[in-house]
Amino acid sequence: MASQEFEVEAIVDKRQDKNGNTQYLVRWKGYDKQDDTWEPEQHLMNCEKCVHDFNRRQTEKQKKLTWTTTSRIFSNNARRRTSRSTKANYSKNSPKTPVTDKHHRSKNCKLFAASKNVRRKAASTLSDTKNMEIINSTIETLAPDSPFDHKKTVSGFQKLEKLDPIAADQQDTVVFKVTEGKLLRDPLSHPGAEQTGIQNKTQMHPLMSQMSGSVTASMATGSATRKGIVVLIDPLAANGTTDMHTSVPRVKGGQRNITDDSRGQPFIKKMHFTIRLTESAITYRDIVVKKEDGFTQIVLSTRSTEKNALNTEVIKEMVNALNSAAADDSKLVLFSAAGSVFCCGLDFGYFVRHLRNDRNTASLEMVDTIKNFVNTFIQFKKPIVVSVNGPAIGLGASILPLCDLVWANEKAWFQTPYTTFGQSPDGCSSITFPKMMGKASANEMLIAGRKLTAREACAKGLVSQVFLTGTFTQEVMIQIKELASYNAIVLEECKALVRCNIKLELEQANERECEVLRKIWSSAQGIESMLKYVENKIDEF
């Protein structure tokens, strides 16, 4: 959201990047906490009240913490002074007892040693208690949105069955505490488990009882994340801070690139240390699927590519999500994207790397993936609504005419610079663009690579509605929910009537475009053109 204006609900956290610039973790209105993003201070010029309120709360919290620390120090010093004065008075006032024999001396030594042991045990108990408090404050288990049901227990473990993802979204974060190897609260406990207050006395994994000290992020990764057994995260070890909302480590020039330490690949936003055990999180890596009342929302949020670019893995996930939505009870599909970019088209860096190894095989595989992707849109029976929140480039723009409604943020823009890419048009744009905006405008976009603003795209028919940035999300959700209230059969029949005359034409255009792409990608000149673009491309975001 670096280049757009969205409505801010609250400021959640604050930090400084490596250059000393202040950044704020922003909770966006209309979005969940997993969509929080770090924004530079200059992006929040219109949100001075939210920033002021956050800074005021932080100042009050710091003052309270300072006062508490000072009170503890004063109390400890006073306790030490009292102890010293008591010892001094006792040593002055107490009479010296003469020791007459060895038996009496050995008895006194034993009593003295016993008293020292008692004091040592008491001190160690206090130290252990303090250490456990620290562990309890750092070890948290996050299991929101768990789609699992807990019905049968076999050898101390629960059999996990999926629930409705909508109901799972309503669950709260569960905090585990570990005390001397015993789990006090387990989200997988049987519903009939005995409870004391808010704590459940349940069995735990036998290996978990052997764990001591802090639980690191690597340990959490190996603790059955996708199976839903137990997930322990130490935020200090994972993030370097105690805040669980660490998202984008550094923001530079409006660009959100995060490095996934486990894979060494950059990806855009949305890497919170919150484990969401939803159906979408388990099934997909680069998209998020939300089952809403009457519609399915597919959010493009790529982790394997930058700026929501499309490679074969991302495309296959989108096709699988569309096929699932076609078979479920949803009436329509809402396509949207996370971050400040809707979609920047194909990931040419990925394509060049694969084409260098075996041009013929790789080009055929990529072309088949794109052909299947476009045909899925052409043959999809339910209405598809697209919410374009930012720039749509290449295939991200050419796919829009195959959808039924396209709602754009006024900050969005559209471009299909295929000649700059070193490739030919895709997504049936060779036929949909001329039909939609005329040959002259289509050539301007497909050959000359002209960039259209949201208003211009709406005037040419590429976009159906343009909304203000501040109310974009709210307007989209209001209208999509209204559409979802209509009769499902009527919606499908309306789309079928509109598409019946051009469906075959679109499939033939897709076949021709993919054949040309295969020829270009299997040639040395085609790979050289793409490589040149990748090396010389300018970041416009």
UniProtKB/Swiss-Prot annotation:
It holds the Pfam family ECH_1. Testis specific. Residues 72-104 are annotated as: Disordered. It catalyses: L-lysyl-[protein] + acetyl-CoA = N(6)-acetyl-L-lysyl-[protein] + CoA + H(+). It is an enzyme of class 2 (transferase). One of its GO terms (cellular component) is nucleus. Its main location: nucleus. One of its GO terms (molecular function) is transcription corepressor activity. GO terms for biological process: spermatogenesis. Residues 87-97 have a biased composition (Polar residues). Its EC number is 2.3.1.48. Gene3D superfamilies: 2-enoyl-CoA Hydratase, Chain A, domain 1, 2.40.50.40, Lyase 2-enoyl-coa Hydratase, Chain A, domain 2. InterPro entries: Chromo-like_dom_sf (IPR016197), Chromo/chromo_shadow_dom (IPR000953), Chromo_dom_subgr (IPR017984), Chromo_domain (IPR023780), Chromodomain_CS (IPR023779), ClpP/crotonase-like_dom_sf (IPR029045), ECH/Chromodomain_protein (IPR051053), Enoyl-CoA_hydra/iso (IPR001753). It is found in: Nucleus. Transmembrane segments: none annotated. Signal peptide: none annotated. Residues 6-66 form the Chromo domain. PROSITE patterns: CHROMO_1, CHROMO_2. Keywords: Acyltransferase, Nucleus, Transferase. May have histone acetyltransferase activity. This is Testis-specific chromodomain protein Y 2. It comes from Homo sapiens.
